[in-house]
């Protein structure tokens, strides 16, 4: 089942943000598209916060307590389980 997921993020320098919508049908595709989104829109090396939204479901994350310029691959293990729960709840 295909899901439309809205993504928003801001980057560490505080100078901007990115947003967009992806349409995916599996968690692996969601993870791949999320990573691509960060690379394209948020400058992967400086993600400060992000949120994903679908219907009434949402997941928000920030790295304000982490050193600046952490990329998503540095924190993926801590958010992957929560994102999978979010994705499965999204209709």
Task: Give the location of each predicted region.
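Acidic, low-complexity, intrinsically disordered interaction modules
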Residues: 12-80
């Amino acid at each position: 089942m295909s899901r439309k997921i809205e993504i928003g993020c801001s980057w560490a320098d505080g100078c901007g943000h990115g947003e967009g919508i992806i349409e995916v049908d599996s968690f692996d595709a969601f993870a791949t598209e999320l990573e691509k989104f960060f690379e394209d829109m948020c400058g992967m090396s400086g993600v400060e916060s992000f949120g994903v939204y679908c219907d009434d479901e949402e997941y928000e994350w920030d790295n304000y307590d982490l050193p600046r310029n952490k990329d998503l691959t540095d924190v993926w293990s801590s958010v992957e389980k929560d994102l999978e729960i979010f994705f499965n709840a999204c209709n």
